[in-house]
Amino acid sequence: MRAGLATTLLFASAFSHAGCFLNEHLEPYYGRVVVPQSQQFRWSDGGLPQTFDPAFAAAPPDTDLVRAIFEGLTDYDPQTLMPVPAVATKWEASNGGRTWTFYLRDDARWSNGAVVTAQDFVRSWQRTVKLGELAPHTELLANIEGTEKKAAVSTTQATPQPSQPPRPASSTQATAREPQQPFGAEALSDRVLRVRLRRPDMNFPALVAHPVFRPVKLDVDAPAGKLLPSGLLSNGAFSVAETDNERVLLARAENYWDKQQVTLQSVEFVGARDTESALAAYRSGGVDAVTNAALEPLAIKLLAPYTDFRRTTFGALTYYTFNTARAPFDDIRVREALAIAIDRDRVSTDETGGATEPAKRFLPQTPTEAPKTVVGKSDMLEKDDERARQLLAEAGFPDGKNFPVVRLLVNRNEQQRVVAQAIAAMWLSVLNIKTELVIKNWDDYEAAVRSGDFDVVRRGIVMQTTDELTNIRTLFGEGYPGTAAASETERLHQPGAEPSEANKLFGPAAKPSTTRPAIDTEAQALNDLSAMPIYFASSYALVKPYVTGFDANVLDAPSLKKVRIDGNWKPPASPASNNAR
């Protein structure tokens, strides 16, 4: 409440000084715009980075720093999110997409001048796998051969509460591994890396753009130790220059193979106590960009008219999973009826205050993706009351007669309660189906999910990649436990919550125990509908108009390589000056 009040007062003060009421001219930018004379990018990114290690980076600002100082086999084009060459100049698939060969460039160097080799990638990936649950995104390597493991003796730890980081595995915990194949990443030479996968993945080059796949230079194999900034060797466009309690300063890397294309001389991650101080720094001209600030719906509405305010769909999905082990939710007609009776546009607009985007499919749309093929239905879950009632009648429940009360399980969270009540009202209005809303604290909620004590349950995921197989297997596959991003998704919409509080909120996402055919594609997921998407989160940024190349995307993963300060930027002519002419 205190943080929310402070934000409201901050905006009220800002608007009154700027003369931004409805009957006055609205300034185009939020705060002072003074073009810097140097190529230094000052970035308030939700706090200061807490780790410099690709294996331990869970979320921004840690992942943003890792992307700046380390480079992987591929990188994302920040606009299209297509994989582009990085350390690897080219790659090729064989064996139906189960084997990938990457060819490394000759001029890739570490910051000490040493050559970046294929073996660096092998050792780094093996280190991450050995870290297990200590590394927040180890599961992204799960499709590589030789990473399989089978739990025995001990029970699985519960997913951490949103207010707590995951606990390291107990030393008394026993884990038995199945007889393993050799590790699937192999250095055929210094310049050639071959990777064997458990399942075909034609989008694997997109997956390895994730920070967890970026190599580190290790003199000794110490898997449990985090890399420290002092003396850190890196291979990216920037290297660590200075660190203290108020900032992290990066400098353009002199040994980077593509340094001629890097305009920025330095990047400064600027610390901020909270959202209010970050916005105040931006308004006064102290920083060039603000991202990962916990903005309330009111603040979002007040910022929306400004030209330098950006809003982008973020790949954090809230979805509802059906317990298909229970009748009548084992009937696809029932699941589809419930799915298309929901007005997702209204949920996003009314129930979340316009702070989310309606999710009518499981994966956020990217600019270059091919259309989905869905048998006998639309590839989007559009509201269709007539078809929903028809499907329910075909399933034996005309006008909802004799349909059991739906037990809808959600974790204790005000926004999730409001959304669940709205969806329950839609089911009652369209299908004449009643709902019992079951709200539980986090531990009890997770226990109910594990035991299957629900008909429908609210879940969440923060997608780490555009790789379709990885995202869909995270949602639906036994071998891909994924992340318990319900807590992260909630954090994005909780007033007063800061991004740095949630950097480690990743753990296994529980699934209903019923055995079902494997789902590897979004088209299969839309055909099966064992779960239904509800909404995507949104990410927000304030970026000064003289900053170019800072592109937002659904992964919330901007690249610094093409960012520059346009020293020749001039404000557009105001309507008043045009009329004077």
Show where each model-derived region lies:
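A structural "hinge/loop" feature
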Residues: 45-64, 87-88, 114, 137, ...
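Gly/Pro-rich hinge or "lid" segments in bacterial periplasmic/extracellular proteins
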Residues: 153-182, 191, 199-266, 274-276, ...
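Extracellular/periplasmic solute-recognition and catalytic clefts
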Residues: 241-249, 268-326, 349
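N-terminal lobe/hinge region of extracytoplasmic solute-binding protein
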Residues: 43-95, 126, 230-234
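Extracytoplasmic/peripheral linker and loop segments enriched in polar/acidic and small residues
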Residues: 176, 186, 381, 433-450, ...
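Aromatic- and charge-enriched surface segment that lines or borders ligand/interaction sites
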Residues: 89-140, 194-196, 281, 328
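Structural transition elements
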Residues: 357-395, 412-418
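Ligand/substrate-recognition segments at binding pockets and active sites
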Residues: 245, 393-464, 539
